[in-house]
Design a protein with these regions (language model features):
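Peripheral (often C-terminal) accessory segments that flank ATP-dependent C-N-forming ligase machineries
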Residues: 42, 194-305
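ATP-dependent carboxylate/phosphate-activation module, predominantly the ATP-grasp catalytic core
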Residues: 99-100, 105-154, 166-215
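Protein-protein interaction modules outside structured cores
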Residues: 1-21
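Active-site nucleotide/adenylate-binding loops and adjacent lid/helix of ATP-dependent enzymes
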Residues: 18-148
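Short beta-strand element of the conserved SAM-dependent methyltransferase core
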Residues: 60, 92, 117-121, 164, ...
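A short glycine-rich, hydrophobically flanked beta-strand micro-motif that places a catalytic Asp/Glu
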Residues: 154-167, 245, 268
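Short secondary-structure junctions
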Residues: 46, 87, 152-156, 235-243
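Residues at beta-strand starts and edge strands
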Residues: 56, 99-101, 158-160, 210, ...
Length: 305
């Protein structure tokens, strides 16, 4: 929530930053969270588990997942494997290949009026080492997804986050990606408030520059104590835009939505990738691993690749 401090917003305007809130706010558009519908509107071969694919491999995931983080996703390589791993509430779809892009889009009555694209370096098991917030457009993504938005979200005004592989939509969210909004430029959040309050988009970018969002992971099943003073010191390093702590010390571990491969501790947003990677390395010791609840062992912090 640190990004939103000091941004004036009318009391009657609600801007969703998570899928649970967006689902409640937009009953007419919340069908986009149904992955069967995302496939069907694009003519992709797909089906719920129980309907056998005609060819393998396929990609499998929950039909609905409002908590994200790649929960429940897997590749099914063969018919034999499919018979073993069928799961109620899951679907299969094509295993796509190509560039995986996360795109934030400002939309007015279904028409895209602003785009920003981000690509991630995957570590596996739903984890990403870092993300690059690109300055340049993605013409193929904007052409294909712009036409899809105009056909299927007419009447909707607000932010949309689209995840694509090779310009094919795999996820649609009725919100923006709040991980790196400070890298979009001064005045962006104020423009978001105006979009939701008045239905206008008037954000003007003098010049775009790329940014980077570097992720620090720990291990599942371990509680961590944060050295807040050290975190604040690193926030002041030149080239760092922000450091976000991505969990709550006072909440049970299982209450946090996390990827299968690790427990996300913090995010370093920066303008220089080398600076971000160095700050992550220095940040890791600020998270002291307490004893694991079952094994009684102190688990080492994962700092990326």
């Amino acid at each position: 929530m640190q990004y939103f401090a000091g941004v004036v917003c009318p009391a009657d305007v609600v801007i969703p930053t998570d899928d649970e809130e967006a689902y409640r706010l937009y009953p007419a558009e919340r069908w986009v969270y149904n992955k069967l519908a995302i496939c069907e509107t694009q003519g992709l071969e797909h089906g719920p588990h129980g309907i056998e694919p005609r060819r393998f491999p396929v990609f499998s995931k929950p039909i609905y997942n409002l908590r994200g983080m790649g929960a429940g996703t897997t590749v099914i390589a063969s018919r034999d494997e499919y018979e073993r791993v069928q799961t109620p509430g899951h679907l299969w779809m094509p295993l796509l290949d190509g560039e995986h892009v996360s795109s934030d889009v400002a939309v007015v009555d279904g028409t895209p009026v602003w785009w920003r694209h981000t690509t991630g370096v995957a570590l596996g098991d739903g984890m990403f080492d870092y993300w690059t917030v690109a300055a340049e457009p993605r013409p193929a993504v904007e052409a294909y997804c712009g036409e899809w938005l105009s056909r299927h979200l007419r009447g909707y005004t607000g932010l949309v986050n689209l995840e694509t592989i090779d310009a094919t939509i795999i996820e649609c969210h009725l919100r923006f990606a709040d991980q790196w909004v400070d890298l979009y430029g001064e005045g962006w959040l104020e423009s978001v408030v105006e979009l939701y309050a008045d239905g206008r988009w008037r954000f003007h970018e003098a010049a775009r520059r790329p940014g980077y969002s570097v992720v620090l992971f720990g291990c599942h099943g371990v509680r961590y104590r944060i050295d807040g003073e050290r975190v604040n010191e690193l926030r002041r390093v030149p080239g760092v835009s922000s450091i976000q702590i991505t969990f709550h010390e006072d909440r049970p571990l299982e209450m946090h939505a996390m990827p299968p491969g690790g427990f996300r501790l913090a995010i370093v947003n920066c303008w220089d990738l080398a600076v971000g990677l160095l700050v992550r390395e220095r940040l890791a010791p600020a998270f002291r691993a307490l004893q694991a609840p079952d094994a009684g062992l102190v688990t080492q912090v994962i700092g990326g690749e």
